[in-house]
């Protein structure tokens, strides 16, 4: 949501990513095994493993960690007059409160909010086809 978050919900993910990076493992199997020491959702592990190849992460873990507060931050913007799609997981705490809906409505007055009922925050990984279908429907 276009909303500043104050809590770090990804601390264990960062611990897992750094553990793999520091172990200097080459294989995806060993990397996933290390991640399981920190993470208990296999779907999250497998999603993150898509970005691990030849013994390294395809994204900059250090930069993400060092700038995590910037990622959580959001400056309220002037209303955007463009039609905008937000897709949320029905089981996610993101885009779930009156405060979130109000922030979206104020900044994106033409927003459409879709829900993928049986998905959490990682809906793009959990219910990929449903997310793709909703995006296609919106764009058509």
Task: Label each PLM-derived region with a short phrase.
Residues 1-27:
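Flexible "cap/lid" loop of the alpha/beta hydrolase fold
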Residues 22-78:
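Conserved alpha/beta-hydrolase catalytic His-Asp/Glu region
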Residues 54-108, 112-115:
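Conserved serine/cysteine hydrolase catalytic core
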Residues 23, 90, 117-119:
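Short, solvent-exposed coil/turn elements at secondary-structure transition points
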Residues 7-10, 97-98, 125-129:
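Conserved strand-to-helix beginnings and helix N-cap segments that scaffold or border functional pockets
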Residues 2-3, 91-93, 120-121:
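Short, solvent-exposed loop/turn segments at secondary-structure junctions
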């Amino acid at each position: 949501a276009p909303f500043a978050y104050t809590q770090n919900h990804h601390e264990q993910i960062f611990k897992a990513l750094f553990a793999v990076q520091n172990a200097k493992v080459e294989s995806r199997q060993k990397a996933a095994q290390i991640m399981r020491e920190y993470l208990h959702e296999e779907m999250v592990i497998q999603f993150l493993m898509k970005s691990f190849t030849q013994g390294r992460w395809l994204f900059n873990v250090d930069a993400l960690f060092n700038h995590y507060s910037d990622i959580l931050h959001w400056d309220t913007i002037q209303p955007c007059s463009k039609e905008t799609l937000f897709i949320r997981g029905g089981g996610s705490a993101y885009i779930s409160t009156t405060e979130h809906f109000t922030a979206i409505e104020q900044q994106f007055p033409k927003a459409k909010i879709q829900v993928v009922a049986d998905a959490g925050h990682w809906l793009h990984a959990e219910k990929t086809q449903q997310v793709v279908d909703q995006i296609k429907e919106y764009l058509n």
